[in-house]
Amino acid sequence: MAVRSLWAGRLRVQRLLAWSAAWESKGWPLPFSTATQRTAGEDCRSEDPPDELGPPLAERALRVKAVKLEKEVQDLTVRYQRAIADCENIRRRTQRCVEDAKIFGIQSFCKDLVEVADILEKTTECISEESEPEDQKLTLEKVFRGLLLLEAKLKSVFAKHGLEKLTPIGDKYDPHEHELICHVPAGVGVQPGTVALVRQDGYKLHGRTIRLARVEVAVESQRRL
């Protein structure tokens, strides 16, 4: 075994020497020779830029980038300040609009109520303590006509502004619209759980209940044994 290994090693050495001789006969430097390493090192050094130019170029690039970033920061700061000013102006304008809406929101309603007040004033002028007995009948007729006109005007004003009167006789009891006063026995033709009597009318404004109707609700009467 040792002889075979020795023989194989000799063959390898002989082949390597023959290969080296043929390589040098052609004038080519050996791949692992000192000349080859020197030439490769010189080629690498010739391609590298001088070390003296590296730091100044990097520093200059950083300065340019810093100036650019500083300009961007200044621009963003100006935009941010303008946005804050615009938001503040919008907030003040909105607040002013809300205050005006609170003050003048019922302006139209008040204007219509003034006409109702005029009718009421003219009606009261018809009543005088110094009126003669024979004129009392005529005065009462005028007052009655004035009250009818006043009621009609109020209904017109309420309808114009979305104010709806609730008179829920016969309707099913609804705690969101009705205030229960008491229960009463259900009479003929009256269903239990429905409104039998309205003590005070309720009102809705644009579909929202602003005053509950005070009602009496019918219940099934108990049979006596």
From Swiss-Prot:
Subcellular location: Mitochondrion matrix
Residues found modified as N6-acetyllysine: K142
Interval spanned by the transit peptide: 1-32
Superkingdom of source: Eukaryota
UniProt xrefs under InterPro entries: GrpE, GrpE_coiled_coil, GrpE_head
Primary residence: mitochondrion
UniProt keywords, alphabetically: Acetylation, Chaperone, Mitochondrion, Transit peptide
Molecular function as annotated in GO: adenyl-nucleotide exchange factor activity; protein homodimerization activity; protein-folding chaperone binding; unfolded protein binding
Protein's job: Essential component of the PAM complex, a complex required for the translocation of transit peptide-containing proteins from the inner membrane into the mitochondrial matrix in an ATP-dependent manner. Seems to control the nucleotide-dependent binding of mitochondrial HSP70 to substrate proteins. Stimulates ATPase activity of mt-HSP70. May also serve to modulate the interconversion of oligomeric (inactive) and monomeric (active) forms of mt-HSP70.
Assembly behavior: Probable component of the PAM complex at least composed of a mitochondrial HSP70 protein, GRPEL1 or GRPEL2, TIMM44, TIMM16/PAM16 and TIMM14/DNAJC19.
Protein name per Swiss-Prot or TrEMBL: GrpE protein homolog 2, mitochondrial
Species whose genome carries this gene: Homo sapiens
Lineage: Eukaryota, Metazoa, Chordata, Craniata, Vertebrata
